[in-house]
Amino acid sequence: MTGKYMPRTVILGVIGSDAHVVGITILEQALSAAGFEVINLGVQTAQDEFVSAAKSHDAEAVLVSSLYGHARQDCEGLHDELDDAGLDVLTYVGGNLAVGQSDFEETQATFRQMGFDRVFDAETDPEEAIEMLREDLQLTTTEAEQIRVDG
């Protein structure tokens, strides 16, 4: 071991039948620039693909995106699958999560009850989500920046 800081691995993808790719592309670039190793599963990703990727890459977080308004249906059971696989990872969900979403606090509560650690709307700045990810992983900005310097 060289003593060099190893980047934290996160899994990123658009769940279900959703084919919106722009948001996760922007998020992937922002996460990479912040020093994370990003495994981008792309669009129309099944729950088992998130679970398999998290397990095979020893990920610390699974970031789920959905913009077409059916995230609740697509995410139902995801945490059961993660638990069944023996994975203890942070889970974030973000986007336009519910059709006709008018009360985001209600949407947040729904997804928190489903087991998500953080819930974001489509207007969330990537830097805000990254800062929360650093906080949740107890990762200092200095450590993340060191990846870019050494990497």
Curated annotation (Swiss-Prot):
Keywords from UniProt, A to Z, are: Cobalamin, Cobalt, Isomerase, Metal-binding
What's its top-level EC category?
A: isomerase
Q: In which pathway does it act?
A: Amino-acid degradation; L-glutamate degradation via mesaconate pathway; acetate and pyruvate from L-glutamate: step 1/4
Q: So which domain of life are we looking at?
A: Archaea
Disulphides: none
Q: Where is the B12-binding domain?
A: 7-140
Q: Mind telling me which Gene3D superfamilies this protein's record contains?
A: Cobalamin-binding domain
One Gene Ontology MF term: metal ion binding
One of the protein's GO biological processes: glutamate catabolic process via L-citramalate
Q: Which reaction does it catalyse?
A: (2S,3S)-3-methyl-L-aspartate = L-glutamate
Q: Record-annotated residues binding adenosylcob(III)alamin?
A: S17, D18, A19, H20, V21, S65, S66, L67, N96, L97, A98, V99, G100
Q: What cofactor(s) does the depicted protein rely on? A: adenosylcob(III)alamin
Q: What is its EC number?
A: 5.4.99.1
**A Pfam family hit:** B12-binding
Q: Which HAMAP family match?
A: Me_Asp_mutase_S
**Could you describe the subunit structure of this protein?**
Heterotetramer composed of 2 epsilon subunits (GlmE) and 2 sigma subunits (GlmS). GlmE exists as a homodimer and GlmS as a monomer.
Entry similarity comment: Belongs to the methylaspartate mutase GlmS subunit family.
Tell me, what does this protein do in biology?
A: Catalyzes the carbon skeleton rearrangement of L-glutamate to L-threo-3-methylaspartate ((2S,3S)-3-methylaspartate).
What is the protein's given name? Glutamate mutase sigma subunit 1
Query: What organism is the protein native to?
Result: Haloarcula marismortui (strain ATCC 43049 / DSM 3752 / JCM 8966 / VKM B-1809) (Halobacterium marismortui)
UniProt gene name: glmS1
